[in-house]
Amino acid sequence: MHATNMLSYTFKVNFLEIFGMTTYKAPLADIKFLLNDVLEMPSIAKLPGYEDATPDMIDAILNEADRFYSEVLAPTNMPADSQGSKLDGNNVITAPALKGVYKKIVDAGWSGLSGSTDFGGQGLPTLLSVAVDEMSHSANMAFSLCPMLTKGVVTALSLYGTKNQKEVYLDKLISGIWSGTMNLTEPQAGSDLSAIRTKAIPAGDHYLLSGQKIYITWGEHDFTDNIIHLVLARTPNAPEGVKGISLFVVPKFLVDDNGLLKERNDVCCVGIEHKLGIHASPTC
């Protein structure tokens, strides 16, 4: 029995030594082959609005993305997972290993790669952005879930937001100055969203929401000054089922029409889930 315990302990140590010290290197040859020869990036680059996406430009971006994510983000993967995120009152303190990484990504312009040029983005093909996101997720998936959710909010607002919502939120979301989340799941409503109970009551020119959401990826953190939540809720007298669900913009801090922050909203995080392999990602 003693020998078995020792062998088990030795295996665990060796496992951490081997896999904890692995480095990430993007399979650039494979990525470029898929983009150019399978998915026909050169043809996409000829479409209106993508004139800047020349082969040389695409190649340079992919090479720099490989360097950036392998040198800046990948080394944070193991320590950030060990450290995890911590809840302090209603505020989340992110893993120390990630301090400064988010700002480096924003400053380097990776957040707005395929964002609309009307709102400060670079307007490059989404296909290129997907390839770069693959590198980011491979380097540190827990961290990369944050910008991934933000892109989802950008897409939703771009397609369905009002003119005012686009003007107030999109430039800061595309640049990464603010982040975003999707709030769907509730304790009694997982895959069956028709069962959600969160209410949205009209109050003048806005709504007052009440309810509980769970499993919200990066629902609270200290990377950005504001977090823009997209929340599913029901208005009074809404029909039953999925047809009675509406989507609301709920910022962590209220925002005026000029995009300036006002007082903190009532939305808050009351707990953090512990998810295997992504402890650095605060799931609220």
Task: Label each PLM-derived region with a short phrase.
Residues 206, 210-264:
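A short core secondary-structure module
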Residues 11-145, 168:
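Amphipathic, small/basic residue-rich leader segments at the start of a protein or domain
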Residues 88-103, 110-115, 181-203, 212-221:
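Flexible, glycine/threonine-enriched loop-and-boundary segments that flank and lead into catalytic domains
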Residues 149-150, 161-205:
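Internal maturation/activation junctions in enzymes
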Residues 260-284:
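Flexible, small-/acidic-enriched active-site or ligand-binding loops
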Residues 112-117, 139-155, 176-186, 246-247:
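Core alpha/beta catalytic barrel or barrel-like domain that forms the active/cofactor pocket
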Residues 188-191, 220-222, 239, 275-282:
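Short Gly/Pro-enriched turn/cap motifs at secondary-structure boundaries
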Residues 3-6, 10:
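Short hydrophobic alpha-helical segments enriched in small aliphatic residues
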